[in-house]
Amino acid sequence: MHLLDMRKILTFSLPLVIIFGGIILFAYRGTWGKTDIEFRIHINEQLVLESAFGESPTFAIWLEDPSTGSKKTVFVTRRAAVGDWEGKAEVPVALPQWFEVYKIENETKNLPNFEKPASLAVTGATPKPGYFITRARVDPGGKWICWIEVNLSGDYNEYYQQYNQVTKIEDKYGTGQPALLYRAKFEAVEGAVITPDIFGMCVPDSTDGNLIQPLKSITTATHIFDEISIAIVKPLPKIIDTQR
């Protein structure tokens, strides 16, 4: 190969190498000094099929800083995020605890709606039954409380009926069993795997307050998520960083 040809190859290749190296550095830039919290949830297909409406559950995930009490949403299904309740103006019983988080984050007294929805960055389509995975990026070693709230519409049982013949009370929102709240406290140390525990059931304006402990008359709702885990993992390099 002639020296002139070698120079041409180098002249052409060097900028490509520099560009490629720059892309790699840029992709890793957002991971330096960070760690990811990975949420892995399995939605029980059988319970979804057996529910009155056959729709996947509405749920939200958020993190709380135990030192300040501040909260930030990691993920919320679209129906709750925008208030899309198919003809109903509001369904305050869907995710009562997360709605309070939304109000603080958005400085409002109202529930999410089309005019003022939850942030697009944390909103996602309602996952189909099966595995759902999402991540949040945080500083290593930080202490957190994770909250997960879930409701499967129309998962009626003998205690929570569509229409109670004795009390003559109708479930006007189609809620079924009340939303359940899961909780986990952990430190963001890579390699840790945490399993959240059920913390209570969420019933707005009840005599016991919005959060009721222990569970009352709950049956199948505890199996809507038949697997939940929180893992502290290395961040994935990305050219476009979508982590929250």
Where do the language-model regions lie?
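Structured domain cores in non-transmembrane regions
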Residues: 66-157
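Ser/Thr/Pro/Gly-rich low-complexity linker/stalk segments immediately outside membranes or between
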Residues: 27-40
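Short, Lys/Arg-rich N-terminal segment immediately upstream of the first membrane anchor
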Residues: 1-7
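Short beta-strand/loop motifs in extracellular/secreted proteins, especially
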Residues: 57-59, 72
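Hydrophobic membrane-insertion alpha-helices, especially the h-region
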Residues: 9-28
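Beta-strand signatures of extracellular beta-sandwich domains
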Residues: 60-64
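Short amphipathic, basic-aromatic surface patches that mediate peripheral association
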Residues: 37-54, 79, 156
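Glycine-rich, aromatic-bearing surface loops/beta-hairpins
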Residues: 134-244
